[in-house]
Amino acid sequence: SSAFVSCTFERAALHGASFEGCRLTGSTFTECRTRPLTLRDCDLTLVSLAGANLAGVDLSGLRLREANLVRADLTGCDLRGADLSGARAERLMLIDADLRGSRIDAALWMGAVLSGARVDIDQAVLFAAAHGLSIGGDDADGGEG
């Protein structure tokens, strides 16, 4: 395993790179070529991937806690089991992404573009709650109308 802690990758050509069992904690990726990219069992806690194009990359099971994902493109990504707790997600593109089993905060549900994303039932309830929806069968008028 390797560690690139608090490193700055600027305009790096990372396409075809493979990171396995790697700690990238606090590192910043700016204008990097990142596809295709292999990331397995990596810790990307506090990493900045703002504006990164990672469409279609397998990010399943990765630790992305408190990552900066603002305006990143994760369209079609496999994020099953990923930890996105506390991630900054304004305008994060998660179109057609698989989010089942991932840990997600209300801020991501509010800030990301999620059309076609696959989620668990529990996640759908959290999404609804983040958007202020009330889920339940209690009607004030008893359902008569």
Which residues make up each language-model segment?
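Tandem repeat scaffolds
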Residues: 1-145
